Design a protein with these regions (language model features):
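N-terminal leader/auxiliary helical segments
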Residues: 1-86, 93-303
């Protein structure tokens, strides 16, 4: 979760911009703001060769993104206890699909450069927008909802994952969602290293995941508005800074959360067509329609 602070701050900003009430369960909201990323931490130890749950996380970023999110919203109409998590999930999806093309293009695909890019952006965003120094502020307590995920959330997530991703979930037990959540908290506690002791003990192996105040001075946020290309459609050129993309995502997420809340509070059972269109079926990774099956390949790495 190298991007965790950014997603939490974005979620908080959506609620503030929209004039929405604060979440009833802030930790659950902030956990929801991490979207499906917690799945990538299942059995994250380098000596454990088991990527079943991680593969589900990858599939959720690339396929049936819209239908899964719409089903989550529909479930939360009746199951009010999961609304904080679902609202956070919405904000995660919108920020990812808006900013990931830029991040992929500037990070490239070698080693852990994607994580390194997101860790750096996390530090810059948290410092500017929330006055938080990520390297000396523990993250795990902000999304620690207890020893296990709430039953209602686990039930819904598991059932919808099996509906939309039958191949990836075939060999995954429901309890492994809780394992992934607990492994995420373990990883965040390991990566929290304000004094550099763990970095020394691991011979620098945690560097791509560790927040630090020290990194090379480069234009990570494209504040110079230099040209960059869409990594999956390289003929499509852009000049937006990260902040421009942030504002675009903020506008879109605020509108979708508003439509979602209106749906939840209405007596209408049918899913609103305006909300369906606003969500679409957009890949978290490419920001394009999932049905196009595009793959990010182009890059001009900043590292």
């Amino acid at each position: 979760l190298p991007y965790a602070w950014t997603h939490m701050i974005f979620g908080d900003t959506v609620l503030e911009k929209g004039g929405f009430p604060p979440p009833g369960d802030e930790k659950m909201f902030h956990l929801g703001c991490q979207g499906p990323d917690f799945l990538f931490f299942h059995r994250f130890w380098p000596w454990v060769k088991d990527d079943r749950v991680s593969r589900l996380g990858s599939a959720m970023h690339l396929r049936r993104c819209g239908p899964f999110l719409r089903d989550l919203i529909e479930e939360a109409k009746e199951k009010t206890s999961i609304r904080d998590a679902v609202t956070g999930f919405i904000t995660h999806h919108i920020l990812d699909r808006t900013t990931h093309p830029y991040i992929h293009y500037r990070a490239g695909y070698e080693g852990y450069n994607h994580q390194r890019m997101e860790v750096t952006i996390d530090t810059l965003v948290a410092r500017k927008l929330a006055g938080i120094e990520t390297w000396r502020t523990p993250l795990a307590p902000r999304i620690d909802v207890g020893p296990s995920l709430p039953e209602a959330w686990t039930d819904v997530f598991d059932r919808l994952a099996r509906k939309h991703y039958p191949e990836e979930t075939e060999n995954i037990r429901r309890e492994e969602l809780n394992e992934a959540y607990r492994d995420m908290l373990k990883a965040l506690r390991i990566f929290y290293d304000p004094w550099g002791i763990k970095r020394a003990l691991t011979l620098g192996k945690i560097d791509p995941f560790r927040h630090t105040p020290y990194f090379p001075h480069r234009d990570y946020l494209n504040e110079s508005e230099s040209e960059w290309r869409h990594p999956a459609v390289p003929e499509e050129t852009h000049r937006e800074s990260f902040w421009t993309l942030w504002e675009r995502a903020l506008e879109e997420a605020t509108g979708i959360v508003r439509k979602t809340r209106e749906y939840w509070s209405s007596s209408e059972k049918a899913f609103p067509e305006t909300l369906r269109r606003a969500i679409g079926n957009i890949s978290y990774d490419t920001g394009k329609d999932c049905d196009l099956n595009l793959v990010n390949k182009a890059a001009d790495p900043i590292f």
